[in-house]
């Protein structure tokens, strides 16, 4: 049998399905023994046709491999471009800065430092309003104003090891704009998305791949555990506190919410004061933001890292004027929307290449890939000759050499 033909047919969907049907599994690993292999029936064309099929498969796969390699090169280039856009955005190089525009137009502007002071005032006001509402709901009147002394001013954090920023920008700890972090709970659920009228719990994978995915939710069956205050709402900023080292800290803005789904213990909601969530999103996704998350995440195993709320608040980010945040975010969206379109096209074409590879193999073993030659030696004659050779030269197990002492 032609070696290339055997290798190709062994990789075909028909043979793979037969093997999986006869194989046994242990801990998710498929195992087949020699008897199973001997029972697998293979289509056997004439030897000359096997060679023609092998040549044609090789030719078409070479073209297909070149196409896949080209698509993956573009994919890698888009990944680098995405990173460069985010880097330029966080360094003030993507759009004219507010300082440049103000100087050109002869006007003043609110600097990042002034914005930070305003954020701290707003942060405290929101905290006090939230605490007063909680006491009201609990039926506890705030007679003693001493409860306000429980407010903790956010730490500034050390920034001397960070690079210089454009005029009008300032470094800030994430503790400044975050006035509250909300977390849900973990409990047993049905492993399927909730149906209409049911309530779900968000899984880590719902925030892993760039946008909020409502399909990645579990269904809560215990109505006593449903907490409407923990439901994801449109505009929520969601953050994954636990995942692999490359995925921990992934975050999304919940743009569209059509299902009832609660926060889990691993998916946090940030409540922000005077910070554009779009700006926070792009800074945390940038190289500098990812470096901060890796610096602060804990855990000994690469497969699972965690970043607690206290450490989240220590993340340092650049803070430009609020008008500049909006302009940068809009420009990043404009550029990355093109990237996402191209990435989607590449993903579609890679899937098409995978299907085409299987289609080539299927056609090959249905006798439709190359023309058949009536002058070829019939496969039945070839098979009879193979059986005769096997009967005349029965295989014998090789004798094992005895092991010597010290081997």
How should these model regions be labeled?
Residues 9, 88, 241, 283, ...:
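Conserved catalytic core of Hanks-type protein kinase domains
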Residues 9, 53, 74, 266, ...:
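Amphipathic alpha-helix face/heptad-repeat signature
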């Amino acid at each position: 049998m032609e070696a290339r033909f055997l290798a190709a047919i062994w990789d075909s969907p028909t043979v793979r399905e037969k093997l999986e049907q006869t194989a046994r599994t242990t801990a998710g690993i498929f195992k087949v023994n020699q008897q199973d292999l001997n029972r697998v029936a293979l289509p056997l064309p004439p030897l000359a046709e096997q060679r023609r099929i092998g040549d044609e498969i090789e030719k078409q796969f070479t073209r297909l491999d070149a196409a896949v390699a080209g698509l993956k090169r573009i994919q890698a280039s888009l990944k680098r471009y995405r990173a460069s856009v985010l880097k330029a955005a966080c360094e003030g190089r993507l759009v004219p800065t507010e300082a440049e525009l103000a100087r050109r137009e002869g006007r003043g502007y609110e600097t990042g430092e002034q914005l930070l002071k305003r954020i701290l005032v707003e942060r405290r006001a929101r905290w006090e309003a939230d605490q007063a509402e909680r006491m009201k709901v609990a039926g506890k009147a705030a007679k003693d104003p001493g409860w306000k002394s429980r407010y903790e001013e956010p730490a500034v954090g050390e920034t001397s090891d960070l690079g210089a920023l454009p005029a009008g920008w300032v470094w800030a700890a994430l503790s400044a704009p975050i006035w509250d972090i909300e977390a849900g709970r973990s409990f047993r659920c049905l492993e399927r998305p909730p149906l209409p009228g049911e309530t779900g719990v968000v899984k880590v994978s719902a925030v892993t791949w760039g946008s909020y995915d409502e399909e990645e939710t579990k269904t809560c069956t215990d109505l006593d555990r449903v907490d409407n205050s923990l439901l994801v709402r449109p505009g929520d900023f969601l953050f994954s506190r636990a995942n692999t080292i490359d995925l921990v800290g992934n975050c999304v803005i919940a743009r569209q919410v059509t299902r009832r789904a609660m926060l889990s213990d691993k998916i946090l909601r940030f409540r922000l004061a005077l910070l554009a969530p779009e700006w926070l999103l792009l800074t945390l996704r940038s190289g500098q933001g990812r470096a901060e998350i890796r610096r602060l995440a804990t855990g000994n195993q690469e497969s699972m890292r965690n970043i607690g709320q206290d450490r989240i608040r220590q993340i340092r980010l650049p803070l430009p004027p609020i008008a500049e945040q909006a302009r940068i975010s809009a420009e990043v969206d404009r550029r990355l929307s093109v990237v996402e379109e191209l990435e989607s096209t590449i993903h579609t074409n890679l899937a098409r290449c995978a299907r085409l590879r299987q289609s080539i193999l299927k056609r090959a073993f249905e006798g439709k890939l190359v023309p058949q030659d009536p002058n070829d030696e019939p496969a039945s004659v070839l098979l009879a000759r193979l059986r005769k050779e096997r009967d005349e030269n029965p295989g014998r197990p090789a004798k094992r050499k005895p092991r010597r002492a010290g081997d």
